A protein has these predicted regions:
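Non-heme Fe(II)-dependent double-stranded beta-helix
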Residues: 1-13, 19-118, 123-126, 164, ...
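Double-stranded beta-helix
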Residues: 8, 142-205
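Conserved hydrophobic/aromatic beta-strand scaffold that supports enzyme active sites
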Residues: 15-17, 134-138, 151, 187-189, ...
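Feature marks short, surface-exposed loop/turn motifs that line or immediately flank catalytic pockets
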Residues: 26, 109, 143, 158, ...
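Non-heme Fe(II)/2-oxoglutarate
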Residues: 40, 52, 197, 204-289
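Short, surface-exposed loop/helix-turn segments at secondary-structure junctions
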Residues: 51, 120-121, 173-184, 216, ...
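Generic beta-strand structural signal
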Residues: 96-103, 114-116, 131-137, 147, ...
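Short, conserved beta-strand element in jelly-roll/cupin
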Residues: 119, 126-144, 191-192, 199, ...
Length: 289
């Protein structure tokens, strides 16, 4: 798993890349799922509970933004999410007892796949402590031209920013006046060959540029928490596996830390679509290089 130097880098930066960590056997299985889901999407004219489609999606030219609640959409995706290859790596950072939280597969389609503005994850699903991270794996080689995940080192140790606009609407993005306070010149593009894993602290500020290359950038994202980190508010996109213990033992006590951020909307009452919808309908800020 991770050596001490890698662990220290994660805790210092708020993120870590592990190049080529997922091998060919799993990548082939995951690619088979992607191919099947693209074919399935051709029958749709608009987004549904499984697929978030781009406005120009068609049967002839599919354009999928996201496979929602990925572990519920194919058995292979749940098998991967609980594989020791995955959960043992996460345990190196969060401890031996782990709970599954949520899952999505972002496609970032070729020739203009959406940019995502600077944001932090924890505001959408605050927990009783910050022992929560995202495990992302690039299914294909991903370089700067594909719009890789990009993070601002050290921001996980700073402010939990407000992600509502002045009208009180959830934007899923750090507002412009707060972006102006960030050292965006320190941004690191998290690139790597197929199978590269990106681990993101729940507080680190990150985003991604648009993909103007001729290849899509499929990225499977699973969120895990330490078993003693419990959600404070309803989960925006709960799966049938949300809250399932995937490693170790159930805790006897909850771990509590102060949460200084603003609480998100009541997703169980207002509904949740995605970060793409939130940033678009709330006048998404331009990508900041």
């Amino acid at each position: 798993m991770l050596d001490q130097r890698a662990r220290e880098q994660y805790f210092a930066d708020g993120f870590l890349t592990v190049p080529g960590y997922v091998g060919t056997a799993w990548l082939d299985r995951l690619h088979a799922v992607v191919t099947a889901k693209i074919e399935e999407s051709r029958a749709l004219a608009e987004s549904d509970d499984q697929f978030e489609l781009a406005p120009d999606h068609s049967a002839e030219k599919p354009n999928i933004r996201r496979l929602r609640k990925a572990v519920d959409q194919h058995p292979e995706l749940w098998a991967f999410a609980q594989d020791p290859l995955v959960v043992d790596l996460v345990a190196d950072l969060l401890g031996p007892d782990l709970r599954f939280h949520s899952s999505k597969l972002n496609f970032k389609w070729s020739d203009g796949g959406d940019a995502v503005g600077w944001h932090q994850d924890i505001q959408a699903w605050p927990h009783t402590n910050f022992g929560v991270l995202t495990f992302g794996v690039y299914l294909d080689d991903t370089g700067p031209e594909q719009g890789p995940l990009t993070a601002l080192p050290g921001t996980h140790r700073g402010t939990i920013f407000d992600q509502f606009n002045d009208d009180g609407r959830w934007t899923g993005a750090v507002v412009a006046r707060d972006v102006a306070t960030l050292r965006t010149d320190t941004a690191r593009e998290l690139c790597g060959p197929a199978g590269t894993v990106v681990l993101l602290d729940c507080r680190v500020v990150h985003g991604s540029a648009a993909n103007f290359s001729p290849r899509m950038r499929p990225l499977l994202l699973n969120v895990y928490s330490a078993a003693d980190a419990l959600p404070i508010t309803p989960t925006p996109a709960p799966t049938t596996k949300t809250g399932v213990l995937v490693r170790g033992q159930e805790p006897t006590h909850v771990h509590m830390e102060p949460y200084p951020g603003r609480l998100p909307p009541r997703w169980d009452q207002v509904g949740y679509r995605s970060i793409f919808a939130a940033q678009t309908t709330a006048a998404r800020p331009a990508w900041v290089d």
